Amino acid sequence: IIEPKLDGIRCFAIVQSGQCQLFARSGKLISNFDKTIGNELLKLGDGCYDGELMGDDFVSIMRQAYRKDDINTAGTYLALFDFLPLDEWQLRTDSTTTGKKTRMSCNDRFEELLARLSERFNSDLEHVQAVDRTILENPTFEDIKELHDKYVSCGFEGAMIKDFDAPYRFGRGYEVMKLKVFNDADLKVSGLLEGTGKHAGKLGSFQVLFNGVEVQVGSGLTD
């Protein structure tokens, strides 16, 4: 299974008993999209939905995800690429489960996700959608690279390669691999920009010159 590699915020949503909670990869609760993405996920029914928050650009999504005021969620949506029933989600806390893997295959999980989405298409879902995928049988590297290049030309980061029959793994593993071209560049720093919100008074980002245009770099900065 080949899918585009998204450039957003990893988000795991749990829908249970009429409530929906969205979590970042770190486990931090994301509540700013409850009235948009959260309400639409409730229409899909109980389960665990895995995807990425997408929008105009990564920086703006990050700001809106944790902003406490002046919240603007317009244009932000959840691109889903996996699904787990609640009983399989509980396997993550089962100490007897070897490797903490689930029973449903990658393809079966995605088919269940598509079935839920198709049943609710008449509900006009605007903030939740499934990613596009391509299934290749015994692909060569050239086959995968062709799809990778297509995704990159459409603005994606690269390609995700998934084992058709693999169970869901809680954590990193070889069931899912990524293909991404590495690019580096030496750029002149033209300025320093202050952080916003709780990072006010600290370095927020570097301003650098790229092909004569000033851009900001600093997503990897820490306190």
What is each of the regions a protein language model found here?
Residues 53-55, 80-85, 132-134, 163-165, ...:
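Short, structured patches in soluble enzyme cores that scaffold and shape functional sites
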Residues 3, 9-51, 168-223:
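Classical nucleotidyltransferase
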Residues 72-73, 152-153, 200:
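Extracellular/periplasmic catalytic domains that process cell-envelope and extracellular macromolecules
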Residues 130-183:
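Amphipathic alpha-helical
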Residues 85-88, 152, 194:
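Hydrophobic/aromatic-lined pockets within catalytic cores
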Residues 46, 123-128, 156, 213-215:
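Short aromatic/hydrophobic-glycine micro-motifs
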Residues 1-125:
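Covalent nucleotidyltransferase
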